[in-house]
Each structure stands twice: as C-alpha cells, then as structure tokens.
C-alpha cells in the first residue's frame, strides 16, 4: 500500500490582491496533489491564510473595519481565486480559526515550560511589511542624520524599517544549531533544489543562530500568550504551526495528523521565505519531538523584464485576467512550463501568447484535430484495433514513448515540471512526425495499404490517449476534452499507460472542435499589456498610409535581385545532437529535398536544452550558402533561419504538410 502524501503551500498574507506568483505556488502544489492521487496515493493538500499581525491591524484601521472583518473579506476573495484556478485543496486553514489559535497558545506554554522559550528584551530595526527584524548590517540602505546617527533604513525587500524596543519572548534557536546541522548532513536532499541548503548554512547557521523574538506587545491582533496576555504570539510560531494544526495536532480528532504526518510530507515555498521554513520550522519540530518533513521545495520567482512585479511599474499580472481571456489550462501550462527549477522565470506577454499558439494550438491541438478527422474519413469514426509493428515506424514511436513516459514520472517525482512537460511535448512532436513518416493520405489510396493505415490510426489515437493522461494534473479541461473526442471516459488513474491499452472498437466524435484556437498575436499581446497598465506599449490604431511608414532594418537596404539570389528551402530535421566541445552548437541532419541528407551546424543550443524536440520539425534553411568548416572537423551545409525576441530565440518552421525541399520566397 502506498504511503499517504501531504503537500502544503505557504499560508499567504492577505494584505493585498494575489498575483501570478502566489498562483504559481498554489498551482504547483495542486499539480503534485493531482499526480499523486492518480498514482494511487491518499493525498491531503493544505493551503490557507496567515491572518494575524501588525500590518493587518493597520490596514483594517485604515479601512474603518475590524481586523476580523478585513481578513474575512480577503479570505472570501482568495477562496474565489482558488476556485477559479480549480485548486483541489482538502483544507483551507486560517490562522484565526479557533482550533488553530488554541493549539498555538498551548504550544507556546509548553515551550515556555520546557525552557525553549524565555522572556527578554529586543531592540532592533523592524519592517512592518516583512514582519521581521534586521540588524544595521542587513539593511539594504541606511538613513543617517546630520551627526551621522542611524535614524532608519530600507530592508532587503525594499520596505522601510523603524526602530523597535520592547519586551519579548524568545525561541532558543541557538540551543539547537548543532542538531540542525546534523539533520542537514543526514538529509542532504531535504531542501530542494540543490544548493539552497548550503545557502542557508553559510548565511545563517555558520555565523551563529541568534534566538528569535516570538512575541510582540506593540499590537494586539494575534494569539495572546495565556500566561502573559499583554504579549501576542509572533508570526513564526503562529504561522508555521498551521502545517500541524490543520491535520488535528493536539486536538481530539488527530487521525489525519497520525496518518499524514507519518506519511510523506512535502512543503513548497517561495525562495524568499526559505529561511523560516528551513531553520525555524525544523527547530520547532525538534522542540516538539515531531518527525521532520521529507522535502522542502523552494522555487524561484516570476519576474518581469524590468524586475519584480510592481503596481507603480505597471507590470503586475493577475491570474483572473489571464483565465477570463484565455482559459484556465493555458495559464496552468504556462506557469508550470516556464519557471526553471531553482531559477527565476521572466513573464512576457509575447511568450505567454506564443506558447498558446505554438505549443498548445499547433503542436497538441493540430495533432488531435488531424487524428480525429482522419479516423472519421478513413474508418467511419471507429478506431482500428491496435497491433504492434503494423508499419516500419511503429517500433520507434513506441520506444520513444516508453522512454519519455519514464522521464515524465522521474521528473514529476522530483517536482521538475518543465522537464516533465518537455517529455510530454517530445511525445507530441514524435507523433506529429509519425504522421509525416507514414503518410496516411497515401496509404488510403486505392493502391494503398489499408492494414498499415489502420495501424497508423490506432497508434495516433493511442498516443493521444497517453498524452491526455499525463497532462491531466496540469490541464484537466484539456485532458477531458481529448479523451471525449477520442470517445473515452475522463482520466481517473495513471496505471494503464501503454499504447496497446487503447480500448477496442472505440468511436471518436464525428467532428472535433479545436481545443486551442489560434490567437491574433499582436492583439492579445496588446490586451495583456493594457490589463497590466502598460498603455505606452499598446499599438494605437490610426489610418495606414504606406508611403509615410518609417521603415526600420538592422542592416543595409538591399535590392530585390540581391535577395533573389538567396535560396530558402523547407528542410525536415531527421536527427539532432549536441556538438562535443561546444556549448553553443547543435548538429543537424536534415532532408532539404537534395536526394541525400545535409549537415548543418547552428549555434542555438542554449535555446533548445532538449534538442530532441526539434526532430520532425520542418525548418526554413538557406540552402545555397557556401559550405564552411566548423570546429575543425564538421562541414556545415546551410543556415537554419530563426527569430530573436527579447532574450529568446525560436527556429522558423512551416506546416508539416509542406514537402521537403519546397522553395520559400
């Protein structure tokens, strides 16, 4: 029997509207929860809100309402957002919930009694927005008066700090630093991705852990300390304990805590709060003699070209706008595909619309449309029985799919969503290539091979069924739509993932509806920019007078005759590999209609880390470029055309129906 699986988001601080950064974390956890359920695990998925603190009290006062009313309103909005994003959480915890507050108070008194908490006095620079104290050396900027005395400053987050001096209770972190280091050595994979643990050790543990202030007396919106009610429990005991209280820790009904805390426990957080979860939380668990979580995943941020999202910059992206305009699945796909593990990702409207058009509409949508149409045309809508090796290309397709499915599961277990989706899109690309290889329109002719045609249709339908299964945790609506068009029930598990498992005598829909209609790139990019508040970047409609257009080009103007001397052809990628000794070059074997394949070297390796996704693509190449020697031993017999956009590069392709060697121009 598989172990129960517990996955948590951080609890969000409801001081403002949530943007796609918070949506990313919540969707990422949702994808993992759905995947684990499909793999047969019993899953508990927790999210919620951190509703106490000075900032909430201040904002409520400014709004003329009580703090409770303020957080009630925010909780309603956040729940509505998670419903819009189809988040399959099991519990939505609020730190104002009675059961949570009762456990927080009891734990505080327990730690006080065992001398892991003590009363002292704290003086330091405090950021209300960050709810954190900073030393002078930690401040990003220091303000001084005319005598050189420090009078204020800016926290690393960019928020202003103020000097605070007050009586406070402290958590004895320093008592546990050796145990924490020992734990890190025993569990080197506890913090992911690799490298984050060393960052915590070098920056915070090696300099010496300082005891942590865990109560405040300057505001009242929090859990009162029972034995000293002028103090309220400070955020990092209150907030972190939610992961245990939501399961029933120290409550009458603790069955879920017994089950899931002793199962597999994953926390996912943004890298900005890693310190609190990698240092404070494990030490708190040591004090309470509770088992450690299995994994702490700290992801990067989505940033804009001009830095972090900011309303003043007009670059904040809210998920509601993207869902209402483009649907839910494109947002879930984009966020999970575009943030590299361990790094930040850059959101651009161009990339968002481009991924919908090229990866969802072209690659996946066209494959489904063509498959359903051909099964209707050639077999009256009934999928032929699956047979192995009905054509010379079946074995290669099957082997690639098996290998990519293994990669998919490996990357899903590692919570490496971009690579998991790369594996899926490699299957999609190979299946599209399979259509071109087998040429079903030729097999369907009177003198064609109907048995081979049947095998092709069965393999296409079976491949799409597998794709619908593995994308289900990411894109539930799309998965269900593919299964419906194939005449199948929605995905309910991932246990039957073999081509041969396609049900016999299945009837596809009479006419498939495009699951991702192509978008007008310019119009939709302008729409996103307008919603972000970037009016300066929007195309303005005006009367078009061609003679008045100021033409722009990066190079000198050439004559038509000069351009006409360039021969651009369609070339299909047969093979592609990295070039040994070069980080930039890829080595292509292409069919450009010469009768024999050519070799082309192209410096695009960094833009295509999974170079195999290019196999089967029909590219545009300069065919009459004089061959040249590269890397001393390779001859390059042409140039692959590509387009640069920002810091990205995309090769230029043509429709798969265009024959190899066709002249462009």
Swiss-Prot record:
It comes from the Bacteria. One of its GO terms (molecular function) is tRNA binding. A motif ('HIGH' region) lies at residues 12-22. It catalyses: tRNA(Met) + L-methionine + ATP = L-methionyl-tRNA(Met) + AMP + diphosphate. Its EC number is 6.1.1.10. ATP binds at residue 311. HAMAP family: Met_tRNA_synth_type2. Homodimer. Belongs to the class-I aminoacyl-tRNA synthetase family. MetG type 2B subfamily. Is required not only for elongation of protein synthesis but also for the initiation of all mRNA translation through initiator tRNA(fMet) aminoacylation. This is Methionine--tRNA ligase. It comes from Streptococcus pyogenes serotype M1.
């Amino acid at each position: 029997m598989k172990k129960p699986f517990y996955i948590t988001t951080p609890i969000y601080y409801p001081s403002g509207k949530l943007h796609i950064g918070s949506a990313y974390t919540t969707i990422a956890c949702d994808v993992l929860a759905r995947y684990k359920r499909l793999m047969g695990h019993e899953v508990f998925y927790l999210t919620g809100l951190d509703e106490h603190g000075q900032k909430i009290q201040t904002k409520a006062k400014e709004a003329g309402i009580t703090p409770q009313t303020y957080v009630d309103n925010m909780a309603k909005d956040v729940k509505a957002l998670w419903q819009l994003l189809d988040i399959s959480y099991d519990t939505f915890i609020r730190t104002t919930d009675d059961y949570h507050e009762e456990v927080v108070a009891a734990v505080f008194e327990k730690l006080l009694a065992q001398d892991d908490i003590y009363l002292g006095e704290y003086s330091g620079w405090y950021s209300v927005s960050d709810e954190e104290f900073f030393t002078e050396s930690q401040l990003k900027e220091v303000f001084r008066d005319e005598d050189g005395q420090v009078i204020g400053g800016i926290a690393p987050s960019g928020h202003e700090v103020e000097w605070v001096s007050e009586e406070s209770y402290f958590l004895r972190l320093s008592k546990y630093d050796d145990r924490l280091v020992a734990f890190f050595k025993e569990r080197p994979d506890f913090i992911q991705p690799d490298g984050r643990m060393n960052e915590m050790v070098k920056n915070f543990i090696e300099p010496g852990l300082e005891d942590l202030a865990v109560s405040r007396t300057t505001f009242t919106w929090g859990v009162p300390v029972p034995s000293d009610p002028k103090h309220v429990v400070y955020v990092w005991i209150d907030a972190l304990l939610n992961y245990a209280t939501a399961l029933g820790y120290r409550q009458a009904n603790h069955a879920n805590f017994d089950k899931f805390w002793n199962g597999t426990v994953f926390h996912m957080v943004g890298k900005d709060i890693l310190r609190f979860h990698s240092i404070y939380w494990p030490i708190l668990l040591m004090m309470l003699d509770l088992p450690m979580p299995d994994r702490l995943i700290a992801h990067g941020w989505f940033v804009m070209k001009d830095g972090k999202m900011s309303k003043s910059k007009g670059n904040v992206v809210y998920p509601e706008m993207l869902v209402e305009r483009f649907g839910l699945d494109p947002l879930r796909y984009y966020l999970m595909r575009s943030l590299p593990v361990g790094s930040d990702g850059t959101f651009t409207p161009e990339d968002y619309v481009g991924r919908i058009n090229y990866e969802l509409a072209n690659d996946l949508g066209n494959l489904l449309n063509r498959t359903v149409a051909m099964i209707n045309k050639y077999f009256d809508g009934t999928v032929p029985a699956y047979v192995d090796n009905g054509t010379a290309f079946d074995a290669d397709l099957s082997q690639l799919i098996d290998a990519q499915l293994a990669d998919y599961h490996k990357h899903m277990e590692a919570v490496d969503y971009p690579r998991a989706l790369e594996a899926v899109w490699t299957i999609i690309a190979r299946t599209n290539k399979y259509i071109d290889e087998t040429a079903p329109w030729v097999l369907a002719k009177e003198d064609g091979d109907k048995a081979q045609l049947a095998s092709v249709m069965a393999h296409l339908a079976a491949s799409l069924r597998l794709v619908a299964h593995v994308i289900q945790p990411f894109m539930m609506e799309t998965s269900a739509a593919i299964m419906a068009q194939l005449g199948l029930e929605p995905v309910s598990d991932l246990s039957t993932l073999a081509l041969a498992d396609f049900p016999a005598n299945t009837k596809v829909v009479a006419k498939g509806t495009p699951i991702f209609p192509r978008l007008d790139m310019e119009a939709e990019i302008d729409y996103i920019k307008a919603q972000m508040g970037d009016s300066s970047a929007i195309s303005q409609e005006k009367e078009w007078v061609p003679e008045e257009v100021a033409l722009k080009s990066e190079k000198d103007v050439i004559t038509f005759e000069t351009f006409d001397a360039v021969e651009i052809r369609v070339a299909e990628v047969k093979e592609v590999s990295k070039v040994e000794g070069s980080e930039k070059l890829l080595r292509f074997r292409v069919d450009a209609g010469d009768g024999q394949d050519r070799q082309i070297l192209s410096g695009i390796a960094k833009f295509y880390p999974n170079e195999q996704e290019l196999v089967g693509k029909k590219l545009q190449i300069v065919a009459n470029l004089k061959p040249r020697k590269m890397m001393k031993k390779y001859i390059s017999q042409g140039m692959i055309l590509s387009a640069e956009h920002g810091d990205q590069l995309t090769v230029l392709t043509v429709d798969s129906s265009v024959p190899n060697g066709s002249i462009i121009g």
